[in-house]
Amino acid sequence: VLQSEGLIRIQPRSGILIVKPDLALLRNAFQLREVLEVPAFRHMAGTMPRDALQAIEARHQELLDRSAGLEVTSEVAETVSAFDQAFHFDAVRFLSNPLLQRAHEQAFDCIRLIRLDQLYMLSASAIARTMQEHLAVVRACLARDPDAAVAALELHFARAMQRALGV
């Protein structure tokens, strides 16, 4: 898939060449995520069982509480990245549409490539900010306020895009 999207080139006997991603690719990937995730979080805000939302909130709060003074090792970074990805993937999965899920995974792949290229460094403060942003989305869903959930999600995307660029 990455090769068909022009993100990598496989060179015989030389290996894989990662094509340098640019700002346009990042913007396009986040725009695709927004198109897919906005209806997902709207749907969650209206229909996800309260206990499921409370469990999501509790997991985020636990990670936020642990992030203070956390030494971010490669293992911690992988765990947090997987946690972040699961939050977004689970929202899209809640729509029960495999086509949307595949498109969403592809957008995430683009963002991961850009983070690699930008030498994206995950810090304890970045983890805390991300968890706070996620909590704002989850709490809006708990309040059954889809507009607030979308507003919090859009703010999260704007900040996540800045973090991916190292700004």
Q: Where does each model-flagged region fall?
A:
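Short linear motifs at protein or domain termini
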Residues: 1-46, 99, 161, 165-166
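Short, flexible segments with low predicted structural confidence
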Residues: 1-2, 11-12, 27, 75-76, ...
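General secondary-structure edge motif
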Residues: 6-9, 20, 36, 71, ...
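Residue-level marker of regulatory loop/turn positions in helix-turn-helix DNA-binding domains and
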Residues: 18, 29, 33, 80, ...
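A ubiquitous short alpha-helical element
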Residues: 22-26, 45-49, 71-75, 117-124
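Short alpha-helix boundary/capping motifs
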Residues: 30-31, 46, 68-69, 119-121, ...
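Conserved amphipathic alpha-helical segments that form helical-bundle/coiled-coil interaction surfaces
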Residues: 41, 50-117, 131-140, 148-160
